[in-house]
């Protein structure tokens, strides 16, 4: 009889023990964060209770206790056995019950108060803001998306990551995770990642939508938004993906059924469809750009076939491309009209992120470093059917030398792989692969179903602010009342809101305008949002950075 091997059992036992240790470590982190939240909440409550006991002054408004209550509630969620958090929460119940707002009845005849188009960072964040903070009826706020929740993030190249860092700082500071779309949540805590992948961030958004009990309808594409003369909108939608197949099958079986296209009626519309799924058109960049491949269509840089690539565009998308190609030991040449690796500004939206600069420095030290050519502007791409018998020729022209300003102590990357040329001289670059087009996105506003419902800035502004949709002070279309914009396409006074931590601060501005239009009292909600740094209506604080000495 052959003795039974115990090696497999030992491996299983070891794996189980490792998993148990990991689970316990995760639980301990949760308990530690819960304790920190309780201490922070108690420190907020203490002066308020002193004010209650002081008969010479008015009692604080119930809304002032809400932030502490949110912390105690979050602590209980992290550690259900935290009796101190439960005790502190019970002390506040009577105060908070007085604050429970009364929801006014609908002041219009539309079935929906708000339709939010897009279930990404902006759409989910605004859904939470409208229903949780401004007390709109969740059943009357509908979020639609032609894909899944977080669809654009699911389409990111597998190696692409957030350039803004996540860190769970809320329990210890007045700020919170830069990539969070709702106060009291943190992608860093949920995902255990500082620079999340697209798939990870989509998971965060899905879980947030579930926890917030948002009314989300996926695989539903908006084909038209039609303003009504007396206010409100008719929104035409069609099913996509599996929903479309099911609808078509049902329609084929029953000719008397409703057509595949359906219409929604809503008092307000928030356009939050983003940019990633709407790259610059194939003919809008330069002659021959239709021969190129946009970086947003790359599923994974590791599985991209071929070698010796030409990357057109040197901002974040282009730098992400060359960093990944270098990591895969693939030769590549980057062509950019601006040497963004030399640009230093007081706005994080107009210079490369520190995370990107670190990656470029690493790429330049790789075994196959990229060539960086700037200032060099591509004016044409052609197929090459002669000398190389296939492939592509990228024609570009050198621009005038630029003296980029930077701080006295700024650390610059090495010039070893950076190349310049004589102004006006033309060069040809050959590549056997379709050139990679990394020149940004046209965006859903300019190319989607609402492009006729916005006015645009006619080229005013620089960078992302050029040709931006024109908005009033509430991020409402200047052309179509009741239609609001949320997300990275928002801009004001030449300032762009392309990072999550920027555009999330406009959620409450939009929600406040809509809630007031629906007859809600919003003063307490606005105060709460200001306390959370989620109500940005003064842009003077956005126009300068610390620089080298604060």
Please report, for each region that a protein language model flagged, where it lies by residue:
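N-terminal Rossmann-like FAD-binding beta1-loop-alpha1 element of flavoenzymes
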Residues: 110-142, 310-326
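FAD-binding core/adjacent interface of flavoenzyme oxidoreductases
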Residues: 110-111, 136, 207-305, 414-425, ...
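Glycine-rich active-site loop/strand segments that organize a redox cofactor
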Residues: 139, 146-203, 335-362, 366-369
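Glycine-rich dinucleotide-binding loop and its adjacent helix/turn
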Residues: 197-200, 271-328, 334, 458-473
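A Rossmann-like FAD-binding core segment of flavoenzymes
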Residues: 224, 241-245, 260, 264, ...
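FAD-site-proximal beta/loop scaffold in flavoenzymes
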Residues: 289-303, 423, 430-432, 437-497
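C-terminal, flexible cofactor-proximal segment of oxidoreductases
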Residues: 442, 460-550
């Amino acid at each position: 009889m052959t003795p039974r091997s115990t090696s497999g059992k030992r491996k299983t036992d070891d794996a189980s023990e490792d998993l148990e240790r990991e689970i316990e470590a995760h639980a301990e982190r949760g308990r530690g964060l819960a304790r920190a939240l309780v201490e922070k909440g108690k420190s907020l409550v203490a002066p308020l209770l002193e004010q209650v006991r002081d008969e010479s002054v008015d009692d604080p408004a119930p809304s002032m206790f809400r932030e502490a209550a949110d912390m105690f509630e979050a602590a209980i969620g992290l550690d259900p056995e935290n009796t101190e958090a439960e005790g502190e929460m019970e002390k506040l119940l009577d105060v908070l019950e007085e604050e429970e707002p009364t929801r006014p009845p609908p002041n219009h005849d539309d079935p929906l108060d708000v339709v939010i188009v897009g279930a990404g960072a902006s759409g989910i964040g605004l859904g939470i803001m409208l229903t949780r903070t401004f007390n709109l009826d969740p059943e009357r706020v509908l979020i639609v998306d032609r894909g899944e929740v977080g669809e654009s993030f699911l389409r990111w190249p597998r190696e692409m990551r957030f350039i803004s860092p996540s860190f769970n700082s809320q329990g210890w500071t007045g700020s919170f995770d830069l990539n969070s779309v709702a106060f009291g949540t943190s992608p860093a805590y949920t995902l255990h990642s500082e620079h999340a992948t697209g798939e990870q961030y989509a998971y965060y958004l899905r879980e947030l939508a579930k926890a917030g009990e948002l009314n989300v309808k996926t695989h539903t594409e908006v084909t038209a938004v039609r303003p009504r003369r007396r206010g409100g909108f008719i929104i035409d939608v069609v099913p996509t993906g599996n929903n479309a197949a099911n609808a078509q099958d049902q329609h084929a079986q029953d000719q008397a059924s409703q057509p595949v296209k359906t219409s929604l009626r809503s008092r307000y519309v928030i356009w939050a469809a983003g940019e990633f799924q709407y790259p610059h058109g194939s003919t809008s960049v330069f002659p021959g750009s239709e021969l190129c491949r946009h970086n947003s269509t790359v599923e994974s840089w590791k599985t991209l076939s071929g070698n010796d690539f030409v990357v057109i565009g040197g901002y974040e998308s282009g730098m992400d491309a060359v960093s990944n190609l270098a990591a895969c030991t693939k030769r590549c040449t980057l062509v950019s009209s601006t040497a963004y690796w030399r640009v230093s500004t007081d706005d994080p939206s107009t210079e490369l992120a520190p995370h990107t600069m670190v990656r470029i420095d690493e790429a330049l030290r790789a075994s196959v470093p990229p060539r960086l050519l700037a200032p060099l502007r591509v004016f044409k791409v052609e197929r090459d059917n002669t000398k190389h018998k296939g492939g592509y020729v990228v024609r570009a022209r050198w621009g005038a030398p630029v003296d980029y300003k930077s701080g006295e102590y700024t650390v610059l990357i090495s010039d070893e792989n950076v190349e310049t040329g004589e102004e006006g001289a033309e060069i040809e670059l050959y590549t056997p692969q379709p050139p990679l087009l990394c020149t940004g996105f046209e965006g859903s506003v300019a190319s989607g179903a609402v492009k006729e419902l916005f006015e645009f800035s006619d080229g005013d502004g620089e960078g992302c602010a050029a040709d931006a949709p024109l908005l009033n002070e509430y991020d409402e279309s200047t052309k179509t009342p009741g239609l609001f914009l949320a997300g990275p396409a928002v801009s004001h006074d030449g300032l762009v809101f392309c990072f999550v931590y920027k555009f999330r601060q406009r959620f409450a501005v939009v929600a406040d305008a809509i809630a007031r239009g629906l007859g809600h009292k919003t003063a307490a909600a606005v105060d709460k949002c200001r306390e959370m740094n989620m109500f940005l209506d003064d842009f003077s604080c956005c126009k300068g950075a610390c620089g080298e000495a604060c």
